[in-house]
A protein has these predicted regions:
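A short, conserved structural fragment
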Residues: 158-177, 452-454
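Helical catalytic core of nucleic-acid polymerases
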Residues: 103-104, 130-151, 303-425
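Polymerase palm active-site segment centered on the conserved acidic dipeptide of motif C
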Residues: 467-492
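C-terminal accessory/binding modules appended to enzymatic or scaffolding proteins
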Residues: 425-450
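Acidic, glycine-rich two-metal-ion catalytic cores of nucleic acid-processing enzymes
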Residues: 179-361, 458-460
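Catalytic palm active-site di-aspartate
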Residues: 326-327, 366, 453-465
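Short amphipathic alpha-helical interface segments
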Residues: 33, 51-55, 74-147
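Short amphipathic alpha-helical interaction segments
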Residues: 146-164
């Protein structure tokens, strides 16, 4: 067999490289010189069609736990599934019948895709869904957050439904843009066949679909601002304990209660954005730099959480106007309760010298001092919080142009709240948020036992105005029980 001649020119080296041939007859210096001489092709941006770009801008993640909940929705899903199977048989895609486990997985996949596509189309006709197609991602070990049927056959099901006209795919790709190499996820939207099928059910609404019991409602995750970018926002798998089982049972009770609640908007009110009144299943999310069930735990994912304040004020519960109640100076009061000290009278963000300064600045600084972990990370530190909180930096010049500086503000807060000074800069804020979420859940369950629907918005509870006094009393009782301090409850 003739011996290959070693490349001696940049053109020869480029030819060898294009054919995957390794250069074995050059010294390292000669090899490097030839590589430098060969011009490197510049990556060209991938020109995505305008409709694909728009689809990605409007996309939300696919929700695999959405299910049909009414006879109408179940009938629609069954019709679509039968048509997909018929299309598969007509094309002769499969030579053998699926095994029972594979058949169940295929049916669950089609059901979830149809349910979420229909739900998205009814709630926001211009919206789309992002879906995974990467084999490595779909082949990863399943945890408590994953749908059992999402596996390596998922892209094949997407393609089959796309071929049958029930969905349109805008496939993801690597893209060279302003910030270098970036990837875009695949997005899908309802196809013409699905739109035509939906047209046969004029009474179909988003309320015909809901999240099934398979979705985890007790979520443990890394914080979104974690120092390690690989961990930011990632969910953490965990083993169940009596505590997690109890919390999940509480969320099931509340979610079932909200699912049957009479929630609506005031007649004549035009919301800023479409409101999906069927989005009522909430989860408790425990998110922190070092995630545990003692940090965080607020409730998320319902439609009233993401509503603008103006739209939320137009909510009706049982056709009744509502009022929002929240705790005043909650974290500072919890700090006094933990220290076993009496809580000062009045607004804790306006004690002494603090009353002369803008409350909207003092409040986030005081809470940030409780969140700050400087004395945990450096036990020898005498202070912490070296920068203004990010949420007030932009408005600091407008609202307080003559401020004395962060160091002075910190010192005055420490002086005015001397009994709890030892708790600043020790990262207790997320612990207090966990206590606060415990109080909120306890109040919601107590309201339910009275037949009253309460809707949580972080540290606030929305109730019918006629039940304001009862809700306020319950909030005071539960706060005293959990935080060991007296609460201040007021209208938000």
């Amino acid at each position: 067999m003739p011996r290959r001649r070693a490349p001696t020119t940049p053109e020869d080296l480029a030819l060898w490289r294009d054919h995957g041939i390794r250069v074995r007859h050059l010294s390292p210096a000669e090899h490097a010189a030839l590589h430098r001489a060969v011009p490197k092709p510049k990556p060209k941006p991938l020109a995505a069609p305008l409709e694909t770009v728009n689809a990605r801008l409007k996309a939300r993640p696919f929700e695999p736990h959405r299910e049909p909940m009414t006879p109408t929705a179940c009938d629609l899903v069954a019709v679509v599934f039968a048509l997909v199977e018929e299309h598969e048989q007509r094309l002769g895609v499969r030579c053998r019948k699926r095994r029972p486990a594979d058949a169940a997985s295929f049916k669950a996949t089609v059901t979830a895709l149809v349910s979420d596509l229909v739900h998205q189309l009814l709630s926001d006709p211009d919206g789309t869904l992002t879906v995974p197609r990467r084999k490595g991602q779909l082949g990863e070990r399943k945890n408590r957050y994953d749908a059992w049927f999402l596996g390596e056959t998922f892209p094949r099901t997407l393609d089959q439904m796309g071929d049958a006209g029930f969905l349109i795919q805008h496939k993801g790709a690597w893209h060279y843009g302003t910030f270098g190499r970036q990837s875009f996820k695949t997005v899908i939207e309802a196809g013409p066949a699905l739109v035509a099928t939906i047209g046969q059910y004029p009474d179909l609404t988003t309320a015909d679909f809901a999240l099934g019991e398979g979705r985890e409602t007790i979520v443990l995750k890394w914080s979104n601002n974690h120092p390690d970018a690989r961990l930011r926002g990632r969910k953490v798998d965990y083993d169940d304990t009596p505590e997690t089982i109890r919390m999940r049972g509480e969320m099931t009770t509340l979610n079932d209660w909200w699912a049957g609640a009479d929630l609506s908007l005031s007649p004549g009110h035009s919301p800023e954005a479409p409101v999906n009144l069927s989005r009522r299943t909430m989860s408790r999310i425990f998110s922190a730099a070092d995630p545990t069930f003692g940090l965080g735990g607020r409730l998320y994912h319902s439609f009233w959480i993401i509503m603008p304040t103006e739209d939320r004020a137009a909510l009706l519960i049982g056709r009744e106007p509502v009022v929002s109640l929240d705790f005043g100076s909650a974290f500072l009061r919890m700090a006094y309760g933990r220290a076993g000290e009496p809580v000062p009278a009045g607004d804790l963000y306006a004690v002494g010298k603090l009353a002369e300064w803008p409350r909207d600045i003092v409040k986030p600084v005081a809470n940030a001092m409780l969140d700050d972990r400087t004395k945990i990370d450096d036990p020898g530190a005498v202070s912490g919080l070296r920068r203004w909180p990010s949420d007030i930096q932009a408005r600091l010049k407008e609202e307080w142009p003559a401020h004395p500086g962060l160091a002075v503000v910190r010192a005055v807060i420490e002086r005015e709240h001397a009994p709890i000074r030892s708790m600043f800069y020790r990262g207790v804020g997320m612990e207090f948020q966990a206590l606060e979420s415990r109080i909120i859940v306890a109040v919601l369950l107590a309201l339910r036992s009275m037949g009253v629907v309460g809707l949580p918005v972080h540290d606030c509870i929305i109730v019918p105005k006629k039940h304001e006094a009862a809700a306020k009393e319950l909030m005071m009782i539960e706060f005293r029980k959990v935080a060991k301090a007296e609460a201040e409850v007021r209208r938000a």
